[in-house]
From Swiss-Prot:
Protein name: Rho guanine nucleotide exchange factor 3
GO molecular function annotation: guanyl-nucleotide exchange factor activity
Protein's job: Acts as a guanine nucleotide exchange factor (GEF) for RhoA and RhoB GTPases.
Source organism phylogeny: Eukaryota, Metazoa, Chordata, Craniata, Vertebrata
InterPro entries for this protein: DBL_dom_sf, DH_dom, Endocytic_GEF_Adapter, GDS_CDC24_CS, PH-like_dom_sf, PH_domain, PH_RhoGEF3_XPLN, SOS1_NGEF_PH
Length: 524
């Protein structure tokens, strides 16, 4: 009998005892009272003793599809097992998922009999907007009560460090409480809502205050990752992760929820508009609201991108004065960056700015993660890009030739540069086909932008831009980009952010974006 079978066995045993009592040998229970002390079963020690009470309500993971939500058990269930040693591999049995809450399931079903199918879908979309606000508010409050406050009280982090990581999160809660209150006020007793357009037009402009929070995310994520090297911080966060309230989401998932919610508003509003009849007065207001939120998202994207670019420029270390380049200083946008390896197995961190490619090595300087230049910066306009076929390069730099199949490596591309006596060639390897294609697209588009600005768009191929598979796959524009920003919520620890190449590129998704384990290689 294994440990997990014990509770069931104990229950059955007690039940059998209760059934056998009437069939006993006739000894009355008042004749021989038991003097044995009954010990209450011990409960498993939990993090609840360290964390202030938090309302255990459903948590919604906004970075996934709109219709998918997740929740956790709202009641603590006493554990009848004896206390056991805490394990990092332990999983909480109290955590469970449930389907999204629908409008038609929440309110009286009879109302469906007098509404058209299109109107029901409209009510569902409006309810999704309202429910999302409620979940967001609960998540933000949870982040403060379950993470910020305990770490401050236990001196796990300093107040200054926590302010840097959590940013202006507190100021966002009242904004969303205001919208939720207005949406509830206009909801009829039967649960239906007639108009939401005027409310949204009046409320959406306040989201401009998101710029400071989103612009701080790059620095916040970097500091949080650095603090995880502290055993106390890592231990606290791991215990939280394994506790029911976290829904198995780590701290950064909670801190990234506001950004994820921001980029979803255009999708939510378009869904409401799609099911709104043309003769409904709400249609004009919804169209105006969509224009407002798209403008706000675009502006915040730009500011966030500039903030990210400044952050990494400040952390570049130059071995010699000659490595400094005015193209780096003048850059306002970081198109993409991530860890790669060269063909000698050296880990590199590559930055693609607007007009220059910078290859670095990650180093620790004054207890901060910095990036030491590995080679001279390469101007994008003079860069030659080659998409290498799998097996064309092997470790050590040899070209395809006398080596066995098991020596072949995949996902390589090559960047080279020659200007007079100066020349460089780097064979770089991505961790998979997708990341390789992201790098190729990003570099191609960056070069096209630079050459187009110089009136040389027709010289792309003659400049050495070798066309490879997927050349036509460019980053989406306009509304499509806003939708795709929400789709890249992979939980990878990659630092590669390759979804932006211009000022309009979606910088929001890239704050927590993805290039961990990218493996490019270099051949000089």
């Amino acid at each position: 009998m294994v440990a997990k079978d014990y509770p069931f066995y104990l229950t059955v045993k007690r039940a059998n005892c209760s059934l056998e009592a009437p069939l006993g040998s006739g000894v009355a229970k008042d004749e021989e009272p038991s003097n044995k002390r009954v010990k209450p079963l011990s409960r498993v020690t939990s993090l609840a003793n360290l964390i202030p009470p938090v309302k255990t309500t459903p948590l919604k993971r906004f970075s996934q599809t709109l219709q998918r939500s997740i929740s956790f058990r709202s009641e603590s269930r006493p554990d009848i097992l004896a206390p056991r040693a805490w394990s990092r591999n332990a999983t909480s049995s109290s955590t469970k998922r449930r389907d999204s809450k629908l409008w038609s399931e929440t309110f009286d079903v009879c109302v469906n009999q007098v509404l058209t199918a299109k109107e029901i879908k409209r009510q569902e979309a409006i309810f999704e907007l309202s429910q999302g606000e409620e979940d967001l508010i609960e998540d933000l409050k949870l982040a403060k009560k379950a993470y910020h406050d305990p770490m401050l009280k236990l001196s796990i982090m300093t107040e200054q460090e926590l302010n840097q990581i959590f940013g202006t999160l507190d100021s966002l809660i009242p904004l969303h409480e205001e919208l939720l209150s207005q949406l509830r006020d206009v909801r009829k007793p039967d649960g239906s809502t007639e108009h939401v357009g005027p409310i949204l037009v009046g409320w959406l402009p306040c989201l401009s205050s998101y710029d400071s929070y989103c612009s701080n995310q790059v620095a916040a994520k970097a500091l949080l990752d650095h603090k995880k090297q502290d055993h106390r911080v890592q231990d606290f966060l791991q215990r939280c992760l394994e506790s029911p309230f976290s829904r198995k989401l780590d701290l950064w998932n909670f801190l990234d929820i506001p950004r994820s919610r921001l980029v979803k508003y255009p999708l939510l509003l378009r869904e409401i508009l799609r099911h709104t009849p043309n003769d409904n007065p709400d249609q004009q207001h919804l169209e105006e609201a969509i224009n407002i939120i798209q403008g706000i998202v675009a502006e915040i994207n730009t500011k966030t991108g500039e903030s990210e670019c400044r952050y990494y420029k400040e952390r570049l270390l130059y071995l010699e004065e000659g490595q400094k380049d005015s193209l780096i200083d003048s850059s306002r946008v970081l198109c993409c960056h991530g860890e790669l390896k060269n063909n000698r197995g050296v880990k590199l961190h590559v930055f693609l700015f607007q007009e220059v490619l910078v290859i670095t090595r990650a180093v620790t300087h004054n207890e901060q993660l910095c990036y030491q230049l590995y080679r001279q910066p390469i101007p994008v306009k003079d860069l030659t890009l080659e998409d290498l076929q799998d097996g064309e390069v092997r470790l050590g730099g040899s070209l395809r030739g006398a080596f066995s199949n098991n020596e072949r490596v995949k996902n390589f591309f090559r960047v080279s540069f020659k200007n007079g006596s100066q020349s460089q060639t780097h064979s770089l390897q991505a961790n998979d086909t997708f990341n390789k294609q992201q790098w190729l697209n990003c570099i191609r588009q960056a070069k096209e932008t630079v050459l187009s600005a110089a009136g040389q768009a027709g010289l792309l191929d003659s400049e050495g831009l070798v066309q490879g598979p997927g050349t036509e796959n460019r980053e989406p524009q306009g509304e499509t980009k806003l939708e795709q920003m929400d789709q890249s919520d992979s939980e990878s620890d990659c630092s590669m952010d390759t979804s932006e190449v211009s000022l309009e590129c979606e910088r929001m998704e890239q704050t927590d974006a993805s290039c961990a384990n990218s493996r490019p290689e270099e051949s000089v």
